Amino acid sequence: MRDKIKLVSTAGTGYFYTTTKNKRTMPGKMEIKKFDPKVRQHVIFKEAKIK
């Protein structure tokens, strides 16, 4: 089953993306490099809980 997750910017801007993840194939925390428009550069986004 795919679960919804939130990817939060490590630049400290508060910008986030939402996506889904298959927990069986990827049990660890997700880290991916994506574009943060507030700082206008690609930064690492880390997985966080959706509240």
UniProtKB/Swiss-Prot annotation:
One of its GO terms (cellular component) is cytosolic large ribosomal subunit. One of its GO terms (biological process) is translation. It comes from the Bacteria. Gene3D superfamilies: Ribosomal protein L33. InterPro entries: Ribosomal_bL33, Ribosomal_bL33_CS, Ribosomal_bL33_sf, Ribosomal_zn-bd. PROSITE patterns: RIBOSOMAL_L33. Keywords: Ribonucleoprotein, Ribosomal protein. One of its GO terms (molecular function) is structural constituent of ribosome. Pfam families: Ribosomal_L33 (PF00471). Belongs to the bacterial ribosomal protein bL33 family. PANTHER family: 54S RIBOSOMAL PROTEIN L39, MITOCHONDRIAL, LARGE RIBOSOMAL SUBUNIT PROTEIN BL33M. This is Large ribosomal subunit protein bL33. It comes from Psychrobacter sp. (strain PRwf-1).
